[in-house]
Swiss-Prot record:
The gene is CI. Residues 19-38 bind DNA. This is Repressor protein CI. GO terms for molecular function: DNA binding. Gene3D superfamilies: lambda repressor-like DNA-binding domains (1.10.260.40), Umud Fragment, subunit A (2.10.109.10). Pfam families: Peptidase_S24 (PF00717), Phage_CI_repr (PF07022). The keyword GTP-binding does not apply. Residues 8-61 form the HTH cro/C1-type domain.
Length: 236
């Protein structure tokens, strides 16, 4: 996130806030928050307010340096799990500490029980270390893990169009603000979910140009928890 605008959008998405919510929390106007994003500018005083209110690093807010927040640093795997980047193809032997999981052509081919539709003929795979899968609570043998490309801009800037996501179909417990692959009336999407009283689910897009939706829990099938995503950024 090289711009102040991107970092503010990330903060809004991470905290589950709209621009007016952030403005209210900081005792300023929604137009001021909109100007921060539109003009890609943030005063040090405003950044200090955000830092004190929400715990974000001042250096990160103003300059994009370091980790956004201390609690996000705790999610970084230990060095023993970093490994190295190696070139490989389908003929490369699978190391003992890695597993292959299906890479589907589209989320439409994902099933909530981890199966893959026969129509998905590409046969592509992605490799994960067993340690990584154990760390996120997924099966270390890769069963129940599916990958596919995200489509559309509703989850930007966190998950842009074309990003690769990984879903653990064995983890369907809804935790407010986390990301899930869902199936609603045969429409499969990635969304941020919140539980509400009366057996309701709030379905939120990170891109605040999209309105929140509300649905009955019974009408929303949780395909699985989005535990990983990878973004390729092209040079402008």
């Amino acid at each position: 996130m090289s711009s102040i605008s991107e970092r503010i959008k990330f903060l809004l998405a991470r905290e589950g806030l709209k621009q007016r919510d952030l403005a209210e929390a900081l005792s300023t106007s929604p137009q001021t928050v909109n100007n921060w994003i539109k003009r890609d500018a943030l005063s040090r005083e405003a950044a200090q307010q955000i830092s004190e209110k929400f715990g974000y690093s001042l250096d990160w807010l103003l300059n994009g340096e370091g980790s956004p927040k201390k609690d996000l640093e705790s999610n970084i795997p230990p060095e023993s799990e970093w490994g190295t980047v190696d070139a490989w193809d389908k003929n490369t032997p699978l190391p003992d500490d890695e597993v292959e999981v299906p890479f589907l052509k589209d989320i439409e081919f994902a099933c909530g029980d981890g199966r893959v539709h026969d129509e998905d003929h590409n046969g592509f795979k992605l490799r994960f270390s067993k340690a990584t899968l154990r760390r996120v609570g997924a099966n270390s043998d890769g069963s129940g893990v599916l990958c596919f490309p995200a489509s559309g801009d509703s989850m930007e800037p966190v998950i842009p169009d074309g990003a690769t996501v990984a879903v653990d179909t064995g983890n369907k417990r809804v935790i407010d603000g986390e990301l899930y692959a869902i199936n609603q009336g045969d429409l499969k999407r990635i969304k941020q979910l919140y539980r509400k009283p009366g057996g309701k689910i709030l379905i939120r897009s990170i891109n605040r140009d999209y309105d929140d939706e509300e649905a009955d829990e019974a009408d929303v099938e949780i395909i699985g928890f989005v535990f990983w995503y990878s973004v390729l950024r092209y040079r402008r």
